[in-house]
Amino acid sequence: MSQTPREATPAQQSRRAARELAVQGLYQWQMTGKSITAVESEFRAQIADEDLEDHENWHKVMGIADLALFHELLHNVAADREAIDKTIAPLLDRRLEDLDRIELAILRLGAYELKYRLEVPYRAVINEGIELAKAFGATDGHKYVNGILDKLASRLRSAEVAARRR
């Protein structure tokens, strides 16, 4: 039986869960100033925390997440933050510091994937950013994320974008 276009494969679900965790980890890193290693350790420790208010959901997400991808995204976005921010900043209608922190985390993640994870189609990066913004961002934050990532894709992956638009 073939899957409908809207059904995510287990591998896609695993990558999406990794991105969800990475955005939450980046948000925590931005807000607390803790090291990215400490943030990751806290996330992994929460798997075993039976007293966690949302333990069942947390365990489910961590259970399906591609933890190697989570680690890569979390650490590499943090390590390359300055370069990523310089790539994003010219596309914004406000200062980077004035962005909603969750939207900033999503934009940083999307910029990293557009720049370095070339095996991921640019449309998938944009769609994941939109879904993350719908799940975690402000009411219309997904529209802003969509616009910025679309502009960024045109700059970073011009050949791929041009081929898609033909």
From Swiss-Prot:
CC per GO annotation: cytosol
Domain of life according to the entry: Bacteria
GO terms for biological process, alphabetical: DNA-templated transcription termination; transcription antitermination
InterPro entries assigned: NusB-like_sf, NusB_fam, NusB_RsmB_TIM44
Keywords of the record: RNA-binding, Transcription, Transcription antitermination, Transcription regulation
GO molecular function: RNA binding
Pfam family, one: NusB
Family membership: Belongs to the NusB family.
PANTHER family according to UniProt: ANTITERMINATION NUSB DOMAIN-CONTAINING PROTEIN, N UTILIZATION SUBSTANCE PROTEIN B-RELATED
Name listed for the protein in its UniProt record: Transcription antitermination protein NusB
